[in-house]
């Protein structure tokens, strides 16, 4: 009988220890180590940009990341990734959260979790201002001789390849200087997120114009892509809700988008 009780006690201890281990979350780990690892491409203004001279990130989602770190009571460790490598780096657990203009997709949802959306989006053209009336529809764009430029590995390339059958698709690796290709006439247009077309129009006044950014070709949303952890998602969602309600998000948004 004593042996039975001893065996049961050991079993109970093992179950209790296992349950405690299972209760530990990624959120707990982040707080314990004092850092939140944030993956960013650093090539997608106004969301994120890596200044090669200073090796520092800046952008809307950089400011949001810093605000999230402050709410968590931890420092931010930025991990540079790229659009072609984003999924691979996420699966390798190189970062806890991906920020910097991340579009919600089902392929990404399979691998992790998304926060509540931060922005409604959609693909729309940006072209030289003199030509913007030419490219209002997919049918206008998908014509022989039209050069559609895209950056590789993300939703822009995916959208272009799904919709363009007759026009030329030019893949251009540098997402920072890609708009200069349109400005100087080496490409005719790019179809990208409406928020980016507005920002690039502001950077290139009178040269590049966003085409119907208020009525994009498709529906999409931006959100933060999290490693699969319910506690972390709950925290990020609650932080986003409170930041919207107290005006913090709008203040950061205005600094970059208005």
Language model segments and positions:
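Short loop->beta-strand "edge-of-pocket" segments that line small-molecule binding or catalytic clefts
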Residues: 34-40, 58, 138-153
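Periplasmic-binding protein-like
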Residues: 120-127, 194, 198-241, 258
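Short beta-strand-to-loop elements that line the ligand-binding cleft
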Residues: 75-82, 149-151, 167-175
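Extracytoplasmic small-molecule ligand-binding "clamshell" domains
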Residues: 22-101, 110, 246
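Flexible hinge/capping segments at coil-to-helix
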Residues: 27, 116, 129-146
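A ligand-binding cleft/hinge motif common to bilobed small-molecule-binding domains
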Residues: 84-88, 102-110, 159-162, 179, ...
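Ligand-binding clefts/hinges and TM-proximal coupling segments of bilobed small-molecule sensing domains
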Residues: 23-25, 155-172, 209-213, 240-258
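A structural signal for short loop-to-beta-strand junctions that line the ligand-binding cleft
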Residues: 27, 57-61, 109-120, 210-214, ...
């Amino acid at each position: 009988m004593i042996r039975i009780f001893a065996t049961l006690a050991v079993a109970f201890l093992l179950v209790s220890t296992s349950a405690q281990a299972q209760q530990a979350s990624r959120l707990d780990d982040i707080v314990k180590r004092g850092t939140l690892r944030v993956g960013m491409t650093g090539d997608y203004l106004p969301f994120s940009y890596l200044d090669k001279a200073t090796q520092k990130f800046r952008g809307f989602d950089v400011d949001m990341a810093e605000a999230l770190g402050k709410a968590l009571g931890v420092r931010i460790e930025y991990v540079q990734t790229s659009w072609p490598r984003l999924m691979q780096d996420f699966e390798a657990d190189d970062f806890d959260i991906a920020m910097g203009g991340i579009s919600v997709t089902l392929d990404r949802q399979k691998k992790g979790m998304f926060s509540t959306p931060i922005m409604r989006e959609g693909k729309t053209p940006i072209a030289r201002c003199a030509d913007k009336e030419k490219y209002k529809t997919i049918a206008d764009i998908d014509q022989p001789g039209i050069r559609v430029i895209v950056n590789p590995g993300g939703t822009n390339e995916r959208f272009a390849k799904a919709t363009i059958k007759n026009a030329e698709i030019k893949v251009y690796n540098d997402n920072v200087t890609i708009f200069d290709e349109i400005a100087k006439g080496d490409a005719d247009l790019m179809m990208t997120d409406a928020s980016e077309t507005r920002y690039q129009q502001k950077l290139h006044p009178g040269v590049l114009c966003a085409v119907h950014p208020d009525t994009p070709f498709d529906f999409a949303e931006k959100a933060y892509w999290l490693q699969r952890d319910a506690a972390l998602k709950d925290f990020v969602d609650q932080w986003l809700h409170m930041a919207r309600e107290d005006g913090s998000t709008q203040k950061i948004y205005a600094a970059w988008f208005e």
